Amino acid sequence: MTENFFEKTLAAREIAEIPGMLEFDIPVHGDNRGWFKENFQKEKMLPLVFPNSFFSEDKLQNNVSFSRKNVLRGLHAEPWDKYISVADNGRVLGAWVDLREGESFGNVYQTEIDASKGIFVPRGVANGFQVLSDVVAYSYLVNDYWALELKPKYAFV
């Protein structure tokens, strides 16, 4: 966990290197039993510039991958937007590459993610991470359904 794990208020900032990408501070509440976080609530996120278009097709799927220390996953670029976060005490170094045509093509952004941070990744931006902690539960909310027949549309860089 980062030093400011329990001190954040819900906030968002745009990532200058990759247009449309957003980084969120997520409040985490802890006591002697452990901790709790509200990972995502649409009504609270929309006023913070979370794109309403994320919900336009009425499809939502939440996935969680579990990985061990030093595992490197990615880079994946699927045909959907995603909101990613860490769901446990783990930490990752997240990395993104803009694969969309235009001035930001090839731009890269990296940051460390723990449970107190969320990232909105627009479609066309490749997403990957390396596990820094012993284990991690990496959660991603996407706005389309994964299907084997669509796998040719997915890019693995």
Language-model segments: residues:
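Non-catalytic, conserved peripheral segments adjacent to functional cores
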Residues: 2-113, 133-135, 142-157
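Conserved metal-binding segment of the jelly-roll/cupin
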Residues: 112-134
